[in-house]
Amino acid sequence: APINVQPIVLFAEEGELNPLFGKALNVARTAGTAVMIVDTGRIMGVIVFKDSKAEKVRVIRGFREEEVDDVNALLSILSEGRAKVAVYTFDVNEIIEEVIDSAFAAKAVRRDKKVREE
């Protein structure tokens, strides 16, 4: 089943990242939602809020997955890539794991296809 996304999309130039993400994270925190950060179609991270604290941030770069528990660490990772990012909010009850798993599955399929072609 497709996941129903009600997005908050914020585009930021470098230098605007901190205030924009701060705003997005506050919206997510008060609404009891999770935030998925997408950079040019790749899922960069998912932040799940419980009791007004960031429970986890899963940052996906290529095939590596990193746990980050600090918003500033996440911002520095994002700023290493493209300056334009989008922030999507999900209801916490939505199946966020499915989003992440499907992203990994798609990457794995593409990698496998490339290996076979070589």
Model-derived features with residue positions:
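Acidic, Ser/Thr/Pro-enriched low-complexity segments and adjacent helix/loop capping patches
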Residues: 1-118
